[in-house]
């Protein structure tokens, strides 16, 4: 789990 991946997953889950 990287910071970039975490951000991407978080944005994806919260976004669409």
Curated annotation (Swiss-Prot):
The keyword Nucleus does not apply. One of its GO terms (biological process) is innate immune response. GO terms for cellular component: extracellular region. Its main location: secreted. Conversion of fibrinogen to fibrin is triggered by thrombin, which cleaves fibrinopeptides A and B from alpha and beta chains, and thus exposes the N-terminal polymerization sites responsible for the formation of the soft clot. The soft clot is converted into the hard clot by factor XIIIA which catalyzes the epsilon-(gamma-glutamyl)lysine cross-linking between gamma chains (stronger) and between alpha chains (weaker) of different monomers. It comes from the Eukaryota. Keywords: Adaptive immunity, Blood coagulation, Coiled coil, Disulfide bond, Hemostasis, Immunity, Innate immunity, Secreted. Heterohexamer; disulfide linked. Contains 2 sets of 3 non-identical chains (alpha, beta and gamma). The 2 heterotrimers are in head to head conformation with the N-termini in a small central domain. A long coiled coil structure formed by 3 polypeptide chains connects the central nodule to the C-terminal domains (distal nodules). The long C-terminal ends of the alpha chains fold back, contributing a fourth strand to the coiled coil structure. Cleaved by the protease thrombin to yield monomers which, together with fibrinogen beta (FGB) and fibrinogen gamma (FGG), polymerize to form an insoluble fibrin matrix. Fibrin has a major function in hemostasis as one of the primary components of blood clots. In addition, functions during the early stages of wound repair to stabilize the lesion and guide cell migration during re-epithelialization. Was originally thought to be essential for platelet aggregation, based on in vitro studies using anticoagulated blood. This is Fibrinogen alpha chain. It comes from Meles meles (Eurasian badger).
